[in-house]
Regions:
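Predominantly soluble domains enriched in secretory-pathway, periplasmic, or organellar proteins
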Residues: 5, 11-318
Length: 318
């Protein structure tokens, strides 16, 4: 093979490994110890992956083609190669790992230990390099600011959000929210944090510049939240309402309540086709909703007790 051909071939391989034509959904099935992989182009399950015991949280790393799964009962993190959909490593954490988040540079994995009340920061390139921080009571949802400088932690039993410097791993401030904050999302510019308050039946919108917040009532026992990429709409799963609430962020009002499967938990917005994916714990499925019409498109059978807590959508890379 000629040098030019070798270089061209190598470039094609590199492009194929770093660009994903379709978006993929990674759904943890806590009762089956598996992860269902859904291709959003045809909304079909294309793989079923055996992971650790009691999988709950998900974080995706597109550039490195990795998916991280927290196994709350197995006290571990399963690491999946998204190119092959095979588990390539199992990282023992101890405790009870639940929430996960990846830094924007994809160099650090953050893990919320639900029962031991601490956050674990793991160097992805050297997984034995780990730092610990006590952030609050029963930490659940995690998310990192787009600039990578701040980690936000929903402390369920402290009823607050801990804001942590990722450089020092020190808490810089706390923001009180509703009762039992759990799922988190953030606007693409990092200016607003969205917090689900389970026992308050509400979502808090926190201005990350000054800490001021605004609360919007939603359905019964909300759990997780996902914002549209243009920052105009917010979607909240209501576990005991078997529905999601669609919120207009300009008017700060619920504009639609959309029926889903039983006990919806994890929720994610697919950017290209503008579809919403909701994991239903109660009937082992994922509901797919058209964001342009707020209508249910289909329900996809997955596995026992589907949760998909966190950022479980591997968005298409163009």
């Amino acid at each position: 093979m000629k040098p030019f051909q070798i270089l061209l071939f190598s470039a094609l391989i590199l492009t194929a490994s770093t660009c994903t034509a379709n978006s993929y959904v990674y759904v943890t099935n806590q009762g089956a110890n598996t992860v269902s992989v859904i291709d959003t182009q045809n909304d079909k399950v294309i793989a079923l992956i055996n992971v650790g015991k009691g999988p709950v949280g998900v974080a995706v790393s597109p550039a490195q083609s990795r998916v991280y799964i927290s196994n709350v009962e197995g006290q571990s993190i399963s690491i999946i190669d998204s190119n092959t959909n095979l588990v390539i490593d199992e990282l023992v954490t101890g405790g009870s790992p639940v929430g996960l988040a990846i830094a924007p540079d994809e160099k650090t994995l953050y893990v919320a230990d639900w029962y031991d009340n601490h956050i674990l920061a793991i160097n992805i390139q050297n997984k034995q390099s780990q730092r610990f921080l006590s952030g609050g009571e029963s930490p659940a949802g995690l998310i990192v600011s787009p600039d990578g400088k701040m980690l936000y932690v929903a402390n369920r039993d402290s009823n607050d959000i801990a804001i942590i410097s990722t450089e020092s791993l020190q808490i810089t401030s706390r923001v009180p929210v509703g009762k039992h904050p759990y799922g988190l999302d953030m606007s693409t510019d990092g200016n607003f944090l969205y917090v689900v308050n389970v026992l308050s039946n509400s979502v808090s919108i926190v201005d990350t510049k000054d800490g001021h917040s605004y609360t919007i009532p939603v359905g019964d026992h909300p759990y997780c939240v996902s914002a549209s990429p243009d920052g105009t709409l917010l979607y909240v799963s209501n576990t005991q309402g078997d529905s999601i609430s669609a919120i207009d962020l300009k008017t700060k009002k619920v504009i639609a309540t959309i029926a889903t499967g039983s006990y919806p938990e994890g929720i994610a917005y697919e950017n290209d086709a503008h579809k919403i994916y909701v994991a239903n714990w109660g009937d082992n499925s994922v509901s797919v909703i058209d964001a342009s019409t707020n209508k249910l498109i289909s329900n996809i059978s997955t596995g026992i007790q589907s949760r998909a807590f966190g950022q479980f959508m591997m968005q298409a890379q163009h």
